[in-house]
Amino acid sequence: MYALIRQLLFRLEPEQAHRVSMQLARLGLRIAAVPGVRSLPAVPRRVMGIDFPNPVGLAAGFDKDGEYMDVLEQLGFGFLELGTVTPRAQPGNPQPRVFRIPEHEALINRMGFNNQGAEPLVRRLEVSRHRGVVGINIGKNRDTPPERAVEDYAQALGMVYGVADYVAVNLSSPNTPGLRDLQHEGALRNLIDRLQTERKRLAELHDKRVPLVVKIAPDWEAGELDATLDILLERRVDGIVATNTTLGRTGVEQTPQARESGGLSGAPLREQAEWVLEQVAARRDRRTALIAAGGIMSGEDVTRRLDLGADLVQLYTGMIYRGPGLVQEAVRAAARHAGQPA
């Protein structure tokens, strides 16, 4: 059924197709096309002190402003990561800014943190009936100068803290100029120290400790990843999301879309994301959660990431190419990996 729906959706511009697909799902059309959602096995995981009903989550970027939580929670996800949100609303980059490469099950996007701002998301969560696990991914506004980036992150953390089960710090989007520089050396130390100080204050204010995770890039020069991991592990962040989209074009070099700027996601990212995941898994202690993202297109991919050491996995581009049935496939793969009936 989804193959037919996808043919129709792919006739639309990607952002329009995304909105239409979510509206159709809200009407129940896509839910009806995915039998067995409510009979999915429970695959409980306790990670970062949070009880997840299963380890399969939605990656940031799919529901930036929390507008589709009612739809997404019915698909079988164990958690939703909303955002990226910034302290102030911003339009993102000019359109077109998303490009499909169907023959490679890939996307290139240069969205640029388009979002309504943190405050509207917080209001939606405050009145939402959604009771599942929610992470919120935060970033800096594009017009905030690099020397003030830390304050943007601290402000965003303060805004979302009361409604988040965990907060993901996005330092790795390739579509905000200078953002990835925050992954390195002194800038990273300063940022993590500032956020942990702010988290301590917020924990006392809200009487709860919200885990902080950092989302990292897949693109690293020799030695850079180890240096970044040194800082993240030394500063005892609660988790690491590996990875964001890549600036590389391996596997899609001959396509017309390869000339477009932005981050590449989907199947061509699989090998690179797995390599980074493996490096992080080899370094981290068991206290540091590991969330796998990037190029997860099948249940086999889920099994592979869990084998490599991931505690949780996240889907995005796979949902666009495989549809909501991928969530079921992923959860059942996680159940089999845990030795449970699927």
Swiss-Prot record:
Cofactor: FMN
One annotated GO biological process: 'de novo' UMP biosynthetic process
Keywords of this entry: Cell membrane, Flavoprotein, FMN, Membrane, Oxidoreductase, Pyrimidine biosynthesis
Membrane topology, from the record: Peripheral membrane protein
Signal peptide positions on this chain: none
PANTHER family noted in UniProt: DIHYDROOROTATE DEHYDROGENASE (QUINONE), MITOCHONDRIAL, DIHYDROOROTATE DEHYDROGENASE (QUINONE), MITOCHONDRIAL-RELATED
Assembly and binders: Monomer.
Protein name, UniProt field: Dihydroorotate dehydrogenase (quinone)
Lineage: Bacteria, Pseudomonadati, Pseudomonadota, Gammaproteobacteria, Chromatiales
